[in-house]
């Protein structure tokens, strides 16, 4: 793909064939995330047809890290597991050539020791880094600060630094916002429009997206297919949010409807019908 900016939504012809692989292959996805987001993350993965295992029970990081089809590491998982657990899982994944996703939650919020751990993880070669504008800017070495886990930076500020990070580290950088920006290691840039503001009112929605990115990575045999695949799962997420918002009376009903919408979209697409 040339270094140009493209747009991709759920109706793009390249989207659904990628997503179908998750339902058909049902990949085993291992995740280290925080207890706040674990349930939603697991439900999102189950809804699209993946098989998740989440947590750092004895032996899991070293075992599942190398056995999974893909893995995601949510830095806020340090609430309930250790840096050693995360590094062990990442090293096991790298040794087995298992692709993994890093979500640098709250990077740049002013907690130096925490940020140092994230930088150590990032140096171990994730296939994808996914975060909000402030997190990506901070990881790229910028001066952006976050308000806890919330972004205080704009997408416009983050994209140039995210692109530099993607190119210098030869990985994909996904920046979530009112529209999502997927940045490739050779200067590629895919914009994913859509979604709904209620996603920002559901705890763990961004964290669960990291798991979904891992799920699609697990289905790919070629690294060159990753950029479009990452954009495709963001497009699925956006469309499911739009569907869920139609009948939602608030954040709680939206969260339930969102998981249902993911399942309907995936099942309908696999069966060749409309959701």
Question: What function would you assign to each model-found segment?
Answer:
Residues 161-166, 224-240, 258-259:
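Short, well-structured alpha-helical segments that form the helix of a local strand-helix-strand
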Residues 138, 203-235:
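Short, small-residue alpha-helix embedded
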Residues 10-14, 238-275:
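Charged C-terminal helix
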Residues 1-54:
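Glycine-rich phosphate/adenosyl-contacting loop at the front of the ribokinase-like
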Residues 111-189:
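Conserved phosphate/ATP/ADP-binding segment of small-molecule kinases
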Residues 159, 163, 190-204:
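Short pre-catalytic strand/loop immediately N-terminal to key active-site residues, enriched for Gly-Thr
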Residues 74, 82-131:
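Glycine/small-residue-rich loop that forms an oxyanion/phosphate-binding "nest" at active or ligand-binding sites
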């Amino acid at each position: 793909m040339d270094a140009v900016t493209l747009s991709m939504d759920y109706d793009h012809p390249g989207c659904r064939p990628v997503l179908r692989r998750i339902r058909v292959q049902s990949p085993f996805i291992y995740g280290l995330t925080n207890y706040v987001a674990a349930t939603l993350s697991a439900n999102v993965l189950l809804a699209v047809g993946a098989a998740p295992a989440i947590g750092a029970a004895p032996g899991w990081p070293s075992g599942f890290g190398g056995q999974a089809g893909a893995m995601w590491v949510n830095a806020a998982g340090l609430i309930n597991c250790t840096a050693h657990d995360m590094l062990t899982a990442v090293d096991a994944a790298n040794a087995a050539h298992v692709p993994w996703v890093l979500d640098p939650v709250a990077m740049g919020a002013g907690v130096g020791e925490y940020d140092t751990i994230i930088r150590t993880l990032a140096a171990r070669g994730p296939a994808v880094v996914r975060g909000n504008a402030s997190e990506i800017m901070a990881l790229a070495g910028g001066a952006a600060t976050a308000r806890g886990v919330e972004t205080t930076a704009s997408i416009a500020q983050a994209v140039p630094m995210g692109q530099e990070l993607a190119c210098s580290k030869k990985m994909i950088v996904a920046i979530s916002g009112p529209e999502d920006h997927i940045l490739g290691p050779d200067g590629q840039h895919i914009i994913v429009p859509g979604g709904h503001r209620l996603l920002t009112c559901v705890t763990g929605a961004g964290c669960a997206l990291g798991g979904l990115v891992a799920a699609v990575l697990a289905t790919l045999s070629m690294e060159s297919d990753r950029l479009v695949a990452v954009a495709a799962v963001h497009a699925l997420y956006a469309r499911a949010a739009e569907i869920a918002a139609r009948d939602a009376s608030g954040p709680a009903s939206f969260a339930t409807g969102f998981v249902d919408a993911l399942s309907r979209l995936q099942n309908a697409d696999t069966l060749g019908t409309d959701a």
